[in-house]
Amino acid sequence: MALKERIGTVVSDKMDKTVVVAVINRYPHPTYKKIVSRTTRYKAHDPENTCALGDRVKIRETRPLSAHKRWAIQEILNKTSQTKEVKK
């Protein structure tokens, strides 16, 4: 069985070795045929903490890594040039 893959945007990188990726699914409504967008948020494993907020990434399904984490970062498609500000 093939592993599932999704493409989405990093919406949170505040956890250690974990990012939250928002994936937008578009499909036609069964009755009205209007294109409906639904956003699903996945927690994905990022072992080197390389992803930043706003990055476009490809995630793949993996074994359960924690209570809510079943996806891993496969590659970063578009890197944002944001830098993190350190609060003092």
Curated annotation (Swiss-Prot):
GO terms for biological process: translation. CDD domains: Ribosomal_uS17. It comes from the Bacteria. GO terms for cellular component: cytosolic small ribosomal subunit. PROSITE patterns: RIBOSOMAL_S17. SUPFAM superfamilies: Nucleic acid-binding proteins. It holds the Pfam family Ribosomal_S17. One of its GO terms (molecular function) is structural constituent of ribosome. Keywords: Ribonucleoprotein, Ribosomal protein, RNA-binding, rRNA-binding. Belongs to the universal ribosomal protein uS17 family. One of the primary rRNA binding proteins, it binds specifically to the 5'-end of 16S ribosomal RNA. Part of the 30S ribosomal subunit. HAMAP family: Ribosomal_uS17_B. This is Small ribosomal subunit protein uS17. It comes from Prochlorococcus marinus (strain MIT 9312).
